[in-house]
């Protein structure tokens, strides 16, 4: 059976691994998931990202990041736009997450961007998720 929302599955896997403080997790690869993982790495929410070829679709291995005293860097992840209810934001409506402490992942005509990048480039798009 096919998965109806692979992005929500990826976010749930990250959330679950983070809650039990796993060092790493693996998710089936896709182009959007690779972009999400790269943004999480660039913004400092995860330590590292690896791509593993398995002669099928590939695997993304995500290494989670924890602070001193093993405190979580990712406090929360929330899927916003879902297959049953898409959520779009115009250029001037791109949301801020916790007044800039978190990020919103926005799928735009210029690729997947954070809310800050979307505002800087003055583009809107589909609000995929919030990470804080």
UniProtKB/Swiss-Prot annotation:
Record NCBIfam families: PRK00136.1 (NF001109)
Function according to Swiss-Prot or TrEMBL: One of the primary rRNA binding proteins, it binds directly to 16S rRNA central domain where it helps coordinate assembly of the platform of the 30S subunit.
SUPFAM superfamilies: Ribosomal protein S8 (SSF56047)
Single Gene Ontology BP annotation: translation
Sorted UniProt keywords: Ribonucleoprotein, Ribosomal protein, RNA-binding, rRNA-binding
Domain of life: Bacteria
Oligomer and partners: Part of the 30S ribosomal subunit. Contacts proteins S5 and S12.
Keyword check for Transmembrane: no
GO cellular component, one term: ribonucleoprotein complex
Gene: rpsH
The protein's name in its UniProt record: Small ribosomal subunit protein uS8
């Amino acid at each position: 059976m096919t998965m109806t929302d692979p992005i929500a599955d990826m976010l749930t896997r990250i959330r679950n691994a983070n809650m039990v403080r796993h060092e790493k997790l693996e998710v089936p690869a896709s182009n959007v998931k690779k972009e999400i993982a790269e943004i999480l790495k660039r913004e400092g929410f995860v330590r590292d990202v690896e791509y593993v070829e398995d002669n099928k679709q590939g695997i993304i291995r995500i290494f989670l990041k924890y602070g001193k005293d093993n405190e979580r860097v990712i406090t929360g992840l929330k899927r916003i736009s879902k297959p049953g209810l898409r959520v779009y934001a115009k250029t001037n409506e791109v949301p801020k997450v916790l007044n800039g402490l978190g990020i919103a992942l926005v799928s735009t005509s210029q690729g997947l961007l954070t809310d800050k990048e979307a505002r800087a480039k003055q583009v809107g798009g589909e609000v995929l998720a919030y990470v804080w």
